[in-house]
UniProtKB/Swiss-Prot annotation:
Keywords: Glycoprotein, Membrane, Transmembrane, Transmembrane helix. It comes from Aspergillus versicolor. Notoamides have been shown to exhibit antitumoral activities. Notoamides A-C show moderate cytotoxicity against HeLa and L1210 cells with IC(50) values in the range of 22-52 mg/ml, but the IC(50) value of notoamide D is greater than 100 mg/ml. Moreover, notoamide C induces G2/M-cell cycle arrest at a concentration of 6.3 mg/ml. The gene is notM'. This is Notoamide biosynthesis cluster protein M'. One of its GO terms (cellular component) is membrane. InterPro entries: CorA_TM1_TM2, MgTranspt_CorA/ZnTranspt_ZntB. Pfam families: CorA. Residues 205-224 are annotated as: Disordered. Part of the gene cluster that mediates the biosynthesis of notoamide, a fungal indole alkaloid that belongs to a family of natural products containing a characteristic bicyclo[2.2.2]diazaoctane core. The first step of notoamide biosynthesis involves coupling of L-proline and L-tryptophan by the bimodular NRPS notE', to produce cyclo-L-tryptophan-L-proline called brevianamide F.
């Protein structure tokens, strides 16, 4: 029964080291080829979600490693050791021999793995989690490797193949594969950091623009301002997650470097024979650890910047609320004054009107009222003056709106004219206007033809 091929998940891609200048050859997804020739070197990429694959595929790995595939963890590293009378080496788990569906791992094989957690944030509401993992099986006698890589897209797979250590390094030091894997992972952490930085910077620049005088805010802009605080707190949550994952990544690299030192301490004679490879691998791991520490420090600084942005906006909001309360208080006072004025204004107007020289009360004889014949002059002056006052106020109040509307219409007209001229130029194909045509036109033997653009 072709048990291995039947249980292979659909997202598996197998590459075998053929030793020629091409290096690695694609072998499809038939896991039988790996079990038939365990002395060869294989790199197996698993791109599909491991939880969606057949559960028997997970039984190929150690029980301690299976939670790395199943669970949502933020980082992991482990390495098993074996020993003999003469040396110590990283070895495979003893249970790897007992399961009938596992690769047969001898007692001189290393099984180690490292796992990282990355959150890629495009916007405050659009983000995704990644959990890239590498599982290395290394034979201490032959130096052959079977490497499983989980969670890499095709571009990252290509980069990983290009960044692989040399065959000599892989043969004598399995940690060199972890160093190459960590290099790509730290680049993903760096990309994730800059995505977050762009989000924070966007809101900082938006606040700077808000200080400038501008037109009346649209309904969409007011709705955006209403949602700004939930968005800022979503970004803060993403920053907390990034800081957590990068700290765990730094610790994972520290443990990896420590395990490399333990191996040299316990198997110093054999390590000394390939000390150059060991030192180069340790240098690469320490370099990635320093990158992780730098990103962790920058993430803390970015988080402080973002918290300062939130505090500043909250302060502006509080000041705006105070201004709003003061404005409402002033508005209430003005409403009271206007109401009182409205109560007394009719009586004041009537008394003022009858108190003019157009009216005269005569007690004798008979308490009579006399009205001047020129009373019409009052209305002739008052009505135009009132209309003029209202007109001046209207111009003052609506002038900015009118200027904006005129400018908008001019821009629209200019754009339309430019578009028409462009179309007319494209349709026009004028003939050469030579000297002969000039003479004929001057002597009125040829009519002047003009093309007008509307």
């Amino acid at each position: 029964m072709d048990y291995a091929a039947e249980r292979a998940p659909p997202g598996v891609q197998i590459y075998m080291d053929v030793g020629d200048p091409d290096g690695w050859r694609y072998c499809g997804n038939d896991m039988n080829i790996v079990e038939r020739d365990q002395s060869a070197n294989f790199i197996i990429f698993v791109t599909s979600d491991i939880n969606d694959t057949d559960k028997s595929f997970k039984l190929r790995f150690q029980e301690e490693f299976r939670p790395v595939l199943d669970a949502d963890i933020n980082g992991s590293f482990d390495c098993h050791y074996g020993c003999s009378q003469s040396r110590v080496w990283p070895e495979g788990s003893p249970e790897s021999v007992s399961s009938p569906v596992m690769f047969v791992v001898s007692n001189i094989a290393l099984v180690s793995w490292s796992c990282f957690k990355i959150k890629e944030v495009k916007t405050a509401e659009d983000y995704s989690w990644k959990q890239p993992t590498i599982h290395v099986q290394w034979n201490a006698e032959t130096g052959s490797q079977i490497v499983h890589v989980f969670g890499f897209n095709p571009d990252q797979q290509s980069v990983f193949m290009d960044k692989l250590p040399t065959a000599a390094e892989r043969k004598c030091n399995p940690f060199s594969l972890h160093a190459a894997f960590s290099r790509i992972i730290l680049q993903q952490y760096d990309d994730a950091f800059w995505l977050l930085r762009d989000l924070v910077r966007h809101h900082e620049k938006a606040r700077s623009k808000e200080k400038k005088p501008k037109r009346k805010k649209s309904k969409a802009e007011k709705e955006h301002e209403r949602k700004i605080f939930p968005l800022l707190h979503d970004i803060a949550r993403h920053l907390f997650h990034y800081q957590e994952t990068i700290e765990v990544a730094e610790h994972t690299l520290q443990v990896m470097a420590k395990e490399l030192l333990n191996w040299r301490h316990e198997d110093g004679n054999n390590i000394q024979q390939n000390i150059g490879t060991w030192l180069e691998t340790r240098r690469r791991i320490l370099h990635e650890e320093k990158r992780a520490h730098s990103l962790k420090t920058r993430s803390k600084s970015l988080n402080d910047r973002h918290q300062n942005e939130i505090n500043l906006r909250q302060a502006f909001n509080l000041v705006s609320q105070d201004f709003g309360r003061d404005a409402r208080s002033d508005s209430n006072m003005m409403t009271t004054v206007a109401f009182v004025s409205m109560v007394y204004l009719p009586g004041t107007f009537v008394s003022g009107l009858f108190g003019t020289n157009f009216f005269s009360f005569q007690a004798d004889p008979g308490n009579t009222w006399l009205t001047a014949d020129e009373f019409w002059m009052y209305w002739a002056v008052t009505i135009p003056l009132t209309l003029l006052t209202l007109g001046v106020w209207g111009v003052w109040h609506w002038w900015d709106t009118y200027v904006g509307w005129v400018q908008k219409m001019r821009d629209k007209k200019a754009k339309s004219t430019k578009s028409d001229e462009k179309d007319a130029t494209a349709d026009r194909n004028p003939e050469p206007f030579n000297l002969r045509q000039r003479i004929r036109t001057a002597t009125r033997l040829n009519e002047i033809q003009r093309k007008e653009t509307v």
